[in-house]
Amino acid sequence: MVQQHTPPSDLPVRPPSKVLGLLSAGALLLAACAPGDRVAHTEVGTVDFPTSCSAEAQPELERGLALLHHMMYPQAAEAFGEAARIQDDCAMAHWGLAMANFQPFWGSADIEAGRPHAERAVALEPDTERERLYARAALAFFQGEGISYGERVRNWEAAMEALHTTFPDDPEAASLYALAHLSVAPADPGHQERANRIVREIHEAMPEHPGAIHYAIHVHDVEARADDGVSFARAYEDLAPSIPHALHMPSHIYVRLGEWDEVIDWNRRSADAALEHPAGEYISLHYPHALDYLMYGYLQRGEDEKARGILEELRSRDGYEPHLASAYALAAIPARWYVERRDWEGAANLEPGVPESFDWNRFPAGEAMTWFARGLGAARIGDLEGVSEAVDRLETLETALQNRDDYYWAEQTRIQRLSVTAWRSLAEGQVEEAIQEMREAAELAAGMEKHPITPGDLQPAHELLGDLLTEAGRYAEAVEAYERTLATWPQRYHSILGAARAAAEAGQDDVSRRYYEELAELAGDTDRDEVAEARGWIQAN
């Protein structure tokens, strides 16, 4: 059991710091007028991080660590940078500057930017063994050349385990070890459960610890665990009311449960807050990330005009932070607009690489979203040349991701390519081949967990399988495919609709009624044609 942290004997005992950033009126004015992305005036939660650095640097270290736990990396770098400005030989300030260049759960790191700070933290030889282990753990990730990202994360996990084992009552070491352990294998049930035990113990001892709550939500952002994550989602809602990612994180649980009102509410607040916290000269990745969740939620409820507003809002701005989360959202939002509304002509004509100011070459997985939508759209309208172009481009992007050792997104792109290939086969009249290809894609998808940057697939593979089986007249099998989707993604509009239609064709009237009633309840306040269809079927049967 992690108790309230007792600092090492060579440091003064003091209570955990609740990082409120309570500034004088003059300092508040200075912070408001200064450039950059400081968040010193906001509440960011409770951390317990005694160090041997000066009393003047200590509040910045605490705020920086809390922001690391919130995954607000540019803002954390600002705080740690201020600590280093106050005391340049503060090893933990340089540790923090290194860690702000490492985003473990997003699979991202700037090795060249972070390494000098990790090396400096170690070279300064901090006064305590605990701080020396923190510094060495950062260097374990950043040191060396020609090392894959996955190996770096495993090196960091091993170093964090050593730190946690040596100082088991340090909640910061424990929470960061839980993050490291989860980052190594986020889909592994054993890793999930060990991380869960650690963060639950921290949360019991420190209910406002941002890392414990945040990482617990990630632990439960997997199939079959979301129900147990609701308490953490509720705890995070009020912890840091001005931090964009804190406002967003509860929706990782709510999207798993199909609670669209909650998804919409929290991501609207997150998007608005993100505009107040730029990433230097860029619009923070947290803004388009939240908009993608908003778009997804509105479309599942059939609220097309509100969804259109999100697309227009996204396109009204430029200068997005160059990050995979931004790339994904920039591609996914317009793709969702067409695919979720079954506007196949629009999907087939999506333009890749928009906006042009964004560096798409760095993010093949983002570009793949556009080509996936284009391929599906082209297949549905019978444009075989367009389908083949999409398949070829997806194959190129898949290879590029493999060459970068980005195996997760390479596999996701493979699933997209196989799905488009299946629909091409159907368009060519090769029904059995199409079903076989789509089943292969669906089974591959079933073995992969959702990445935290997405609220859900553009169109889940089992839903695509259900659509394809419906087209082939194999209605009972289609119902099974849709129900498999709904077991993972409850309250998905088109899986509910597909199940209702396929069940009706299969003569399963009770099943059809249940799904049509569910659809009418989900989107009953909208003017979508399918809602009228549902009500008409219920009335006639």
Residue positions per predicted region:
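Inter-helical turn/loop elements of alpha-helical hairpins
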Residues: H70-E78, L97-R132, R136-E151, V184-G190, ...
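TPR/TPR-like (Sel1-like) alpha-helical repeat modules
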Residues: A91, A98, F102, D110-P126, ...
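Short coil turns that delineate tetratricopeptide repeat
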Residues: S54-A55, D88, P126, P168, ...
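Residue at a conserved register position within TPR or TPR-like alpha-solenoid repeats
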Residues: L67, N101, A140, H181, ...
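Amphipathic alpha-helical segments of tetratricopeptide repeats
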Residues: R85, V122-A123, E204, R234-D238, ...
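Amphipathic alpha-helical repeat scaffolds of TPR domains
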Residues: A55-E62, D89-A100, P126-G146, D169-A185, ...
